[in-house]
């Protein structure tokens, strides 16, 4: 049977980093085996599900490059199908109506706890064969097997056994006429032919219940792979503050989508000591059975390292649109400065994110209005007008403005004055950027443009003259 996996988020919020890893592993497993990847939106929680959250999930999937073969399929559009299957179970005596009030259910739980037993439904209506009636407390409960054990071999966790005596008769249809999670996902996965269910290990306790429903329906049981959670850098549960952010916040923070994909792939899975993978290598090497059963820790420094690798090695033209996105967020007029691809070349060895790159690049897009006082005192003092003036003269005469032609002009200026290159470069660097730190001086001047560079040199000469 062809592999079919699914990613099934609930649209009650954004797609966080743990959900993105789940989607990636489902996508990789399907792609590696030549199967299909299905996107299902589990939106039966009508109070908390929102269209904004759905849109955010779809946007994040697109940004990450996790295309799906089917979907998005919405559970709210399948309610009639869930009712059909529930009625089938009722007709076969595998489910039943129950009408207990909230107070009665609370009393059951309190009685169980008083006996130091697990709070649960006591099966009061199990054998009463109650008919349907219009009642605000009406639910449909599944007749869980009383004896025996549920056994399944998890692809990550290994063999898991749960005694049926640990499970009660769970509700499969609520009073509001909607199915519960454990029932809907079984019907969905059955109808959609899902062969591997890859999800977080917070769902392990749901699995025995779901397997019993599969058995009652005579449906094939998929294989299960329960991934351990992602912890923060301190080894505690992720929070918004420690990394469990909206995937699109990683975009806003300046990470490349394929860098995040590479990092997420390694967050729980490995292939020897290899850290960096091309997309094809991930498709060739990934196997969900190789996912570690222990929780992984988020390491933002490692993510930054991976991101910097791709900033250094990707085609600058492919990075440019994402840098332009960051510059636009800073209110920069892109037409007022250099081509973004040229900025990438100049800065990519110096930053870990595109956000850092954009912040450093602003100096070439906006008028230089402030100077570092220490830099001015050290490099724009009396005497600096000589190398600055010579550099200006030769830069003004450059025919074709390029990094190479700028470099030649600056070296000629140093040679003409019999100065070391640093004596020309440092005052020029302060004149162009207002600071003592910048990329290679030829790139720094080139990115300012001929007109911009000459104007900034003139301003520096004026500053020296006024000192």
From Swiss-Prot:
Domain of life assignment: Bacteria
EC number: 6.1.1.17
Assigned keywords, A-Z: Aminoacyl-tRNA synthetase, ATP-binding, Cytoplasm, Ligase, Nucleotide-binding, Protein biosynthesis
Catalytic activity reported: tRNA(Glu) + L-glutamate + ATP = L-glutamyl-tRNA(Glu) + AMP + diphosphate
Motif ('KMSKS' region): 237-241
Extent of motif 'HIGH' region: 9-19
Gene Ontology biological process: glutamyl-tRNA aminoacylation
Signal peptide annotation: none
GO cellular component: cytosol
Alphabetized InterPro entries for the sequence: aa-tRNA-synth_I_cd-bd (IPR045462), aa-tRNA-synth_I_codon-bd_sub2 (IPR020751), aa-tRNA-synth_I_CS (IPR001412), aa_tRNA-synth_I_cd-bd_sf (IPR008925), Glu-tRNA-ligase_bac/mito (IPR004527), Glu/Gln-tRNA-synth (IPR000924), Glu/Gln-tRNA-synth_Ib_cat-dom (IPR020058), GluQ/Sye (IPR049940)
Keyword Aminoacyl-tRNA synthetase applies: yes
Molecular-function GO terms, alphabetical: ATP binding; glutamate-tRNA ligase activity; tRNA binding; zinc ion binding
Binding residues annotated for ATP, in chain numbering: 240
Subcellular location: Cytoplasm
NCBIfam families: gltX_bact
Subunit field text: Monomer.
Similarity section: Belongs to the class-I aminoacyl-tRNA synthetase family. Glutamate--tRNA ligase type 1 subfamily.
Task performed by this protein: Catalyzes the attachment of glutamate to tRNA(Glu) in a two-step reaction: glutamate is first activated by ATP to form Glu-AMP and then transferred to the acceptor end of tRNA(Glu).
Protein name: Glutamate--tRNA ligase
The species this protein was found in: Xanthomonas oryzae pv. oryzae (strain KACC10331 / KXO85)
Lineage, opening ranks: Bacteria, Pseudomonadati, Pseudomonadota, Gammaproteobacteria, Lysobacterales
Gene assigned in the entry: gltX
